Amino acid sequence: MRTTPFNHLDDAFLNIERQEDPWSVHLEVQVSGHIDESRLRDALRATLQKHPMARARFQPYHEATVTYQWEIADAGDHLALDVVTATTEAEIAAARERLISIKVPITVAPAFYATLVHHADGDWLMLSVNHTLADGLSTFRLLTSILRQYAGQPDPVPDFDPLTVRDLKALAGAKSVPERIERIKHLMSYLRDAAM
């Protein structure tokens, strides 16, 4: 089983989230027809296999742990799909509210829940991803992958290992002391202007 360290954003979101205020990213799509539950489950499984971070779970830690780690499971621990039938807009809204009010656990993979709402005017697929695991763009990519898998369309992924490019400091951090000083000057100027 592979592991990858938490980056700075993972750490921040883990420590900000509270049980009474779950931090999740919620996206949904409505289709004009019917979504087949069996095909959707297959699409969810295929998406988990395609995206390593979709199979990530929080690695247990102990007193000697220096950094939090994600464990990348070979497969999901569960398939988090709830299926409901709604006859009114209020029932659709209730399904949505149920989904977004849940604190999606990161100790099991995947760290997201999906709800399929069957409705006479068209079905809904709702997705809620723990914000510690994914931001809005990552959640959009995950939903896009689920939809492509469902439709049997190609779902290309980059030809690099996504677990090796999660270090935000290496990607966007200052590369030298002068650059760091310049960034601090800009930050101080921004804070000074914002305070006025």
For every predicted segment, state its role.
Residues 182-196:
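Flexible, P/S/T/G-rich "lid" or insertion loops adjacent to the active sites of thioester-utilizing
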Residues 1-174:
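Non-catalytic N-terminal regions of enzymes
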Residues 173-182:
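Primarily interfacial, aromatic-capped hydrophobic alpha-helices that serve as membrane anchors
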